[in-house]
A protein has these predicted regions:
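Charged, amphipathic alpha-helical segments and their flanking helix caps
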Residues: 1-32, 44-150
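A short glycine-rich, His/Asp/Glu-containing loop-to-beta-strand
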Residues: 36-40
Length: 150
């Protein structure tokens, strides 16, 4: 049995989203200076659930595993003034749409059986922090994964 956290993270990082860099779990920068960028959150894996599909010893029993992968979009550095806010919200909304379109259009998903935006796929839209705590306009994305193991 092997869960595919690294494989699906690689698959998501390889998505093509116009004007956005997507980082893998081993590529998270210490700052958000190369924006727009999508990075895994520190609580990258949440809502882990395991359902046994058959009985038997753990190494051979069929199981369905579901979990949520959490990412943060850093769009532009937060600044003062109304024009910065309007520019940020327009551009941020566009990048959110492009990323979700790319996820929904994945014909081949390496590592999992299914990958879809969560029910609450977008949270914290507005001011978010980069890894170094600098403030950016951005949001968090949540993607639900489903794997069959063994």
């Amino acid at each position: 049995m092997a869960l595919s956290f690294t494989t699906i993270s690689d698959t998501i990082a390889a998505l093509s989203v116009s004007g956005v860099t997507i980082k893998d779990i081993d590529e998270v920068p210490t700052s958000g200076d190369r924006v727009p960028i999508i990075i895994p959150l520190p609580d990258f894996i949440t809502n882990f659930n395991l359902d046994n599909m058959t009985l038997g010893v753990p190494s051979t029993r069929l199981m369905t595993v579901s979990y949520t992968l959490n990412y943060r979009l850093l769009f532009i550095r937060a600044g003062a003034g109304r024009s910065n806010t309007i520019e940020a919200l327009n551009g941020l909304t566009s990048k959110i749409g492009l990323f979700l379109d790319a996820v929904l259009a994945m014909d081949t998903i390496t590592g999992v059986e299914d990958l879809v935006p969560s029910t609450n796929a977008i949270t914290n839209m507005g001011i978010v922090n980069a890894p170094n705590d600098d403030a950016y306009y951005g949001c968090d994305f949540h993607l639900d994964c489903l794997e069959h193991v063994n």
